[in-house]
A protein has these predicted regions:
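Bacterial Sec-dependent N-terminal signal peptides
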Residues: 1-27
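Outer-membrane beta-barrel biogenesis signature
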Residues: 8, 22-42, 47-58, 131, ...
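Residues on the lipid-exposed face of transmembrane beta-strands in outer-membrane beta-barrel proteins
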Residues: 40, 44, 69-78, 112-117, ...
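Transmembrane beta-barrel strands of outer-membrane/channel proteins
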Residues: 40-48, 87-91, 127-129, 177-181, ...
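Surface-exposed coil loops of outer-membrane beta-barrel proteins
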Residues: 45, 50-66, 95-112, 120-201, ...
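Outer-membrane beta-barrel pore domains
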Residues: 58-64, 95-106, 212-340
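Glycine- and aromatic-enriched membrane insertion/assembly motifs of diderm outer-membrane
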Residues: 62-94, 252
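Repeated loop/turn-to-beta-strand initiation elements of outer-membrane beta-barrel proteins
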Residues: 82-85, 122-125, 172-177, 202-207, ...
């Protein structure tokens, strides 16, 4: 795996140097149009599992009990004619969970920090820390239909620090290749291993690949507009680690828009792990099926999301009281999100 990583790194660097050399001969005397933007979100929620002990599914975010905080997310970005940057900071429990791989003091607030340069028409290079390209769901609650998250999202990568090149081949076809630190090592490379990533986009469907030291993940993310008001999102992934350890899953996201201000959606996810991966159990194999029904009411920049989630596992993994465990769990969440 080390030799493979070195090979991908060399190929990646040669590709960047080639495009940079080609573009160096192209000058543009026009005045650039530059813009600064400030945006972000805040979210808060109430959660109950209707059990004696506060217990939650083993997924990221929206897993605290009672009245709880999500995060405040502030993004400063600059977009010039040829270059730009994004500085994205987070505060609160959701933000802390999102950047758990940052061990330095101030870095625990940094969700994304990167600069990019358009080296040719339809070709850009990005260097820094950016959220992952794998999966259907994202860290920001405003961009997800469901407020709670899936197992596939929770145990895949959150962020990468490295360099990537994006190719916009046409309106419907895109390609990305990149070399990164190991997954979620956001500040620096602490173990000297690197990971290789790639994404192929075809007509709104995306095939994603991430390979590193004893890690390989293949992911499909996409969706289809079945009518003007009905959308079906799809995510499927498989990941293997050292030995036989790994996980796989598939989720469907049907969503129905009933008016300009209301939509209702369902997430049905089947997730399985092998050889004590740790999402469900510490030893052996296990699986979990979850159904999450979410309503989404929107008024301007404000969103209100009531949600009911049912989890059913292959073993008794939910501690519903000091003396009792269960294979199933019912959760209710009520969230408010504001974007700006």
């Amino acid at each position: 795996m080390k030799k493979s990583n070195k090979f991908f790194t060399r190929v990646f660097i040669c590709t960047m140097m080639t495009f940079t050399a080609i573009n160096a001969q192209d000058t543009d005397d026009s005045v650039p149009q530059s813009t600064f933007n400030f945006s972000g979100t805040i979210d808060t929620y109430f959660r109950s599992s209707f059990t004696e002990d506060p217990v939650a599914p083993g997924t990221s975010f929206a897993n605290l009990n009672g009245f709880s905080l999500g995060m405040a997310n502030f993004i400063v970005s600059y977009e010039g004619e040829k270059s730009g940057f994004v500085a994205d900071v987070v505060f609160g429990p959701r933000g802390s969970d999102a950047v758990f791989g940052s061990v330095g003091n101030s870095s625990e607030m940094v969700n994304q920090l990167y600069a990019y340069y358009n080296i040719a028409e339809g070709v850009s290079i990005t260097l820094g820390n950016f959220n992952t390209f794998l999966g259907y769901e994202v860290i920001s609650p405003a961009a997800n239909f469901n407020y709670s998250t899936s197992y596939m999202f929770s145990y895949g990568p959150f962020s990468h620090t490295g360099a990537k090149v994006d190719f916009s081949i046409s309106e419907d076809v895109s390609l990305m290749i990149g070399v990164f630190n190991q997954t979620d090592q956001t500040e620096a490379n602490y173990d000297r291993y690197t990971a290789f990533g790639a994404q192929l986009g075809l007509y709104g469907q995306y095939i994603n690949l991430l390979a590193g030291d004893e890690y390989f993940q293949l992911d499909y993310t996409g969706g289809f507009d079945l009518s003007d008001s009905f959308f079906l999102g799809i995510n499927a992934t498989t990941a293997t680690l050292a030995g036989d350890t790994g996980f796989a899953g598939i989720a469907l996201y049907p969503q129905l828009t009933t008016s300009d201000s209301f939509a209702i959606g369902l997430r049905g996810e089947f997730f399985s792990e092998t050889d004590g991966f740790g999402a469900l159990v510490s030893e052996g194999d296990a699986d979990n099926f979850s159904l999450t029904l979410t309503g989404s009411f929107t008024s301007g920049n404000f969103m209100f999301k009531p949600e009911l989630r049912l989890d059913s596992a292959s073993s008794e993994i939910f501690a519903i009281s000091p003396t009792e465990t269960s294979e199933s769990l019912t959760s209710f969440v009520m969230a408010m999100i504001y974007t700006f």
